[in-house]
């Protein structure tokens, strides 16, 4: 993560409550596109809408950075994350076979033009 934070093409947002870091989300820009690298929420704060807020703000940051398309990959078994991504307009693009040991990864994208 330290390497990611020091990369000039990476941007991260941090969620805090009372100065406690409860989550973060980041992307890596590649020309006019970006890969979402992380969305992490502390276990005790999950299912409270914080992941949605972080991802919504990451999308706004991407727009400010003139990013036209966001990509991500997610474990096929991570149903809550897939639901969140679909709720925010990400579409399934493809599958990475056995990307997570024996589980497939799902590649998703969101076009930001006209968003």
Q: Residue ranges of each PLM-predicted region?
A:
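Acetyl-CoA-dependent GNAT
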Residues: 1-44, 55-61, 65, 94, ...
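Conserved acyl-donor/pantetheine-binding loop and adjacent beta-alpha core of acyl/acetyltransferases
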Residues: 3, 46, 99-101
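Conserved phosphate-binding and hydrolysis motifs of nucleotide-dependent enzymes
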Residues: 19, 23, 49-51, 89
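A generic structural signal for short beta-strands and their flanking turns/coil linkers
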Residues: 32-37, 68, 86, 104
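Conserved functional loop/turn residues at catalytic and ligand-binding sites
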Residues: 40, 44-45, 49, 66, ...
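Conserved acetyl-CoA-binding loop-helix of GNAT-fold acetyltransferases
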Residues: 47-60, 64, 79-87
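C-terminal "cap" of GNAT-fold acetyltransferases
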Residues: 68-71, 75-82, 98-115
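Conserved active-site tyrosine of GNAT-family acetyltransferases
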Residues: 85, 90, 108
């Amino acid at each position: 993560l330290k390497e990611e934070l020091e990369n000039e093409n990476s941007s991260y947002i941090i969620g805090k409550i009372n100065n406690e870091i409860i989550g973060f989300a980041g992307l890596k820009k590649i020309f006019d596109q970006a890969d979402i690298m992380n969305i992490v929420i502390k276990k005790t704060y999950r299912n409270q809408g914080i992941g949605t807020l972080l991802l919504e703000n990451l999308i706004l940051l991407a727009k400010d950075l003139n990013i036209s398309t966001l990509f991500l990959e997610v474990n096929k078994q991570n149903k809550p994350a897939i639901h969140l991504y679909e709720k925010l307009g990400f579409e399934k693009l493809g599958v990475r076979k056995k990307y997570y040991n024996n589980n497939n990864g799902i590649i998703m994208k969101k076009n930001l033009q006209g968003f």
